[in-house]
Structures are given as structure tokens and as C-alpha cells.
């Protein structure tokens, strides 16, 4: 009877979440800086991201924010032990200057509306469901225009079944999610996500397994895009690839980590072979986390009856400061070299970001980004700027 009730609740939650898409992401800046060394301490996912655990909820009120109760519904109601729920809502306002007669452009829109549910079948097996409404600037800015397009933007980026008998140790999961790889930022616009197969709404179906230890972890995934026969809410965007991804991480003294990674993806139009590394270093005296990622990419494009290949490089190097509780401010430099053999094909970006957590469940964000192509920003056509304000509420 208990199992049948769980299955019924899972079905009802799936229908509910389908009516709420965005991206189930994490904040890699909180590793080490919050006193937490493993991303899976705060998230149910063994690689971090998505619905947060009871530990993560405690941290959101006691460490990350200025105060408040981080529990679901602010502690007004506690779900049963076999059920975990959550939601993310983001509202954004932006100014985008990319050149041309219509620049700059201004927009205000709902960036993310996601709901999460996790059902535990005993102590070892769980079902995870996520669903929401794709963020969209849209051409019709009226309220009626916004609401009339909601039905066309249903999406479920993550849904999987997982065997994970303990917080550390082996695990296996199967379903739709991003195969563990890279720094895994909230900001999908960063080059290290856009050009390695981890762009927005590009989650794949995977069979993934690995091991999470106290000071190391390993994740290996076989991935493939959603079948074209699947309904629209289960489809992905971007390059369709199938292949293998692997990520390994070693942590040192609760203050640093080094990770190695590889991703081999093949498709009918484009194939990519990626190898790289990530790293973090926490400096307690100055309350600063340095973090970076660098990847070499071999991209092969099908042209007629043949192929054309090019070598690429993509990187991120940043520093995030935590001057006071509830506030973090970061600066970063990004580089994407579209073809290492051709001069002037480099894309550069400088990012300034401030995140303020005044109370548990609430985040205010300001992001400034300047991009330029080539060795300098000598012309307007070769540069672009973005400024964005965000209000984030998580349940």
C-alpha cells in the first residue's frame, strides 16, 4: 500500500511539474567557502545541482543568507520523510547592447519557473522529477501574450531514477540530466557551458554511475539526446550528440580541488571531443575563492560527403569574494578560441557579478558582462555588453 501511494504521488507530481523549465543548477562558489566540501552534501544529485537536501536548507539560513528559515515553505509545513519538494522562480530585467540599429534592447521577463519533487523508495532508491516553463523574452510583452504562450513552453529538463545507498559510496542513475562535467554554473551564458555541450535546455538522457568519497569523486556517463519521437516538453535544443562523459575530482585539506574531465560526443552533423581540467582554491584570510576551467575541443563538422575539423579552446578564470555574510561578489575573464589555427577568432568576456542573500529563500543578483571578438574592441560591431538584474525566490 505504501509503495502504491508513492507511485500515485509521483504520477501526480509529474503532472504538476509539467505545468510549472529552467535549469537545475548549483553555485560552485559555495564549495569550500561555506565550509562544505562536497556539492552532494547540499544537493540530492551526487554531482550537485537541483533540489537541495535538509543540510543545504540549513546552510541557506545559517551560513549563506543573513538569516531566516531555509526549510521548505519557510518551515510552515514539513513533508514526510519519503518526499522532498522545492521550486525556483527567477524574474529578470536586462539591457543588451550588441550593436545595430535596434541596440540597446531592454526586456523584463520570467527567466525560470521550476518545481522539483523527490520520492524515496526506502533508503536506497529514489525518483527525481523536475518540470517548469522555459524562460522567454518573447515578442508580445503584454500579460495576455505572456500567459497564452505558457502551454508552448512546458519542459522537463530532469527526471531520473537513482540507486544511492548512502551519502558517500557508489551510485547509479538513469534518466534525463546533464552528465557531470565542468564547474556547472547557474549562468548558462558562460563560454565553458555554451561550447562544451552544456548549453541551456540541452540535457541528455544518460546512464551514469560513479563513486563519491570524502575527498574524491568519479562520475562516468553514457549519454544520448532525446529521441525525436518524444513530445516537445521532453526535447532538447542545440547540437544532438551521443557519447561518453567522465569527470573526476580530488579535494585537498577542505580548501582546494583539482578535477579532470573528458567528453566524447558524436552526431550526424557535428562531433566534439573535449578534454580539460577544473580547479578551486579557498583563501580563508581574504575570504576569496579562486576557480577556473580550461578545455580543449576538437570539433568535426560534416560538409557534404566529407568532414572539416578545427581545434578550439574555452576557459574561465574567476575570483569570488565573501566580504560579509549574505554577500558574494565575483569577477571573471572568459576566452573561447573558435579555431586555434586562425587568428582573430577569439571571443573574450569580462564578467562582474554581485549576489545578495538578504534572507533565506531570497536572492538579488546584478550581472554585468562585456564581450569582444579578436585582440581588441576597436569597433562597435566586435563588442557587446549586457547588464542584468535578477530576483530569485526558492521554495
Regions found by a protein language model. Name each.
Residues 36-46:
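The canonical Cys-X-X-Cys-His
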Residues 38, 356, 382-395:
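Outer-membrane beta-barrel "beta-signal"
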Residues 46-48, 91-97, 131-137, 176-180, ...:
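Transmembrane beta-strands of outer-membrane beta-barrel pores
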Residues 79-81, 119-123, 165-167, 212-217, ...:
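Outer-membrane beta-barrel strand-turn architecture
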Residues 81, 102-111, 152-157, 201-205, ...:
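Residues that define the transmembrane beta-barrel architecture of outer-membrane proteins
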Residues 83-89, 127-129, 170-172, 218-220, ...:
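Transmembrane beta-strands of outer-membrane beta-barrel proteins
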Residues 239, 246-340:
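Detector for outer-membrane/organellar transmembrane beta-barrel domains
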Amino acid at each position: 500500500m505504501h509503495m502504491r501511494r508513492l507511485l500515485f504521488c509521483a504520477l501526480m507530481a509529474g503532472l504538476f511539474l509539467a505545468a510549472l523549465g529552467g535549469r537545475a543548477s548549483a553555485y560552485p562558489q559555495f564549495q569550500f567557502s561555506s565550509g562544505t566540501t562536497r556539492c552532494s552534501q547540499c544537493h540530492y544529485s551526487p554531482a550537485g545541482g537541483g533540489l537541495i537536501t535538509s543540510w543545504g536548507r540549513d546552510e541557506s539560513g545559517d551560513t549563506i543568507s543573513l538569516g531566516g528559515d531555509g526549510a521548505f515553505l519557510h518551515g510552515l509545513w514539513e513533508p514526510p520523510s519519503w518526499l522532498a519538494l522545492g521550486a525556483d522562480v527567477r524574474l529578470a530585467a536586462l539591457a543588451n547592447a550588441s550593436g545595430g540599429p535596434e541596440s540597446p534592447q531592454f526586456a523584463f521577463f520570467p527567466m525560470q519557473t521550476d518545481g522539483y519533487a523527490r520520492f524515496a523508495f526506502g533508503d536506497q532508491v529514489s525518483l527525481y522529477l523536475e518540470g517548469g516553463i522555459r524562460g522567454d523574452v518573447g515578442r508580445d510583452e503584454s500579460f495576455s501574450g505572456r500567459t497564452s504562450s505558457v502551454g508552448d513552453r512546458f519542459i522537463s529538463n530532469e527526471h531520473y531514477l537513482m540507486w544511492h545507498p548512502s551519502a558517500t559510496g557508489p551510485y547509479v542513475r538513469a534518466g534525463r540530466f546533464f552528465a557531470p562535467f565542468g564547474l556547472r554554473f547557474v549562468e548558462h551564458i558562460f563560454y565553458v557551458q555554451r561550447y562544451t555541450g552544456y548549453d541551456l535546455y540541452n540535457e541528455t538522457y544518460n546512464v551514469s554511475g560513479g563513486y563519491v568519497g570524502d575527498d574524491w569523486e568519479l562520475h562516468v556517463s553514457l549519454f544520448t539526446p532525446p529521441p525525436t519521437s518524444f513530445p516537445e516538453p521532453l526535447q532538447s535544443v542545440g547540437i544532438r550528440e551521443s557519447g561518453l562523459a567522465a569527470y573526476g575530482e580530488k579535494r585537498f585539506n577542505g580548501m582546494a580541488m583539482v578535477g579532470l574531465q573528458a567528453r566524447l560526443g558524436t552526431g550526424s552533423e557535428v562531433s566534439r571531443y573535449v578534454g580539460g581540467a577544473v580547479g578551486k582554491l579557498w583563501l580563508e584570510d581574504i575570504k576569496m575563492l579562486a576557480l577556473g576551467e580550461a578545455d580543449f575541443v576538437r570539433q568535426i563538422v560534416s560538409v557534404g560527403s566529407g568532414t572539416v575539423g578545427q581545434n578550439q579552446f574555452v576557459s574561465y578564470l574567476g575570483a569570488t569574494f565573501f566580504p560579509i555574510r549574505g554577500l558574494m561578489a565575483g569577477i571573471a575573464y572568459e576566452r573561447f578560441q573558435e579555431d586555434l589555427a586562425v587568428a582573430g577568432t577569439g571571443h573574450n568576456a569580462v564578467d562582474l557579478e554581485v549576489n545578495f542573500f538578504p534572507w533565506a529563500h531570497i536572492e538579488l543578483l546584478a550581472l554585468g558582462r562585456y564581450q569582444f571578438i579578436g585582440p581588441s574592441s576597436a569597433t562597435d560591431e566586435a563588442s557587446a555588453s549586457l547588464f542584468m538584474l535578477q530576483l530569485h525566490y526558492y521554495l
